[in-house]
Design a protein with these regions (language model features):
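Hydrophobic alpha-helical transmembrane segments of small proteolipidic membrane proteins, enriched
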Residues: 2-32, 142, 152-154, 162-165
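Membrane-interfacial helix-loop-helix connectors in multipass membrane proteins
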Residues: 141-155, 224-229
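Short His/Asp/Glu-rich catalytic/ion-coordination signatures at enzyme active sites or charged loops
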Residues: 159
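Membrane-helix exit/interface motif
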Residues: 110-116, 138-148
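Core segments of transmembrane alpha-helices
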Residues: 130-139, 213
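Polar-ligand-bearing catalytic/cofactor-coordination segments
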Residues: 2-6, 27-129, 162-216, 223-229
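Hydrophobic alpha-helical transmembrane segments of integral membrane proteins
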Residues: 11, 15, 19, 128, ...
């Protein structure tokens, strides 16, 4: 049983589709967000104003919207019930700014409605955090000590895979909600709706790439473990 096999064996070929998709997704989200950061939305509303309007309309006036440093550091915190927007999104009036702001509000609406995939994902976060940090240590122990450790590491790594897969419906649903809110509240017109969809679709592709990478890595690890049995 040799640790270099984790990197140099033929099963590495399984990861090539995920690597290529990840590269494409990274390029796509970067180029698309940059492109539409330069396109001003017709209404001239900032990301903060859009978020506030969507939240208030959906009975979430108690949820604060705050600026945070960094680029595309936007997120919704279900524990703190807070929408955090990067400064470029918070103060910006671009298509990207209002689209990202609406997407994070989509998560807030999911939280209010106890959207099942989001509830499940939040529930497994502590376990996933532990598993993601411990799995590779135990997997490497499996190569040096005993294959039983390898299978234990694979079991822990599977928690990360589950998290990545469950993230997909959460993110796609949040984007769907965002587009509906932008349209129903009259924040965007028909052409802008299409542009917003491009921004959110590009962002969603990164989650697809991450999920595919995790699944293929899990399959690869299982094949390596079986070959050492």
């Amino acid at each position: 049983m040799y640790p270099y096999g984790l990197y140099m064996d033929r099963t590495f070929l399984l990861l090539i589709p995920a690597i290529l998709l990840s590269m494409y997704a990274s390029f796509k989200v970067s180029s698309t967000t940059k492109k539409y950061f330069k396109v001003r939305a017709m209404k001239g509303m900032t990301g903060q104003e859009v978020a506030r309007r969507i939240l208030d309309y959906n009975g979430l006036s108690s949820v604060p919207v705050r600026p945070v440093p960094g680029s595309l550091t936007d997120h919704y915190d279900p524990r703190g019930k807070t929408v955090s927007l990067s400064e470029e999104v918070f103060y910006g009036t671009s298509i990207t700014s209002i689209s990202v702001a609406a997407h994070e509000c989509g998560h807030a609406i999911q939280d209010k409605e106890s959207y099942a995939p989001m509830v499940f994902r939040s529930a497994i976060v502590p376990a996933v955090n532990f598993a993601s940090s411990a799995s590779w240590i135990i997997i490497m122990m499996g190569f040096f000590v005993s294959r039983q450790f390898l299978w234990l590491g694979i079991l822990l790594f599977s928690a990360t895979v589950i998290f990545q897969v469950v993230t997909l419906p959460v993110e796609f649903n949040a984007s769907s909600r965002a587009l509906k809110q932008l349209e129903s509240l009259g924040i965007v017109g028909l052409d802008e709706h299409k542009e917003s969809k491009k921004v959110l679709s590009a962002a969603a592709l990164t989650y697809v790439a991450a999920a595919l990478a995790s699944i293929l890595q899990l399959v690869r690890l299982a094949l390596l473990a079986r070959s050492d049995d």
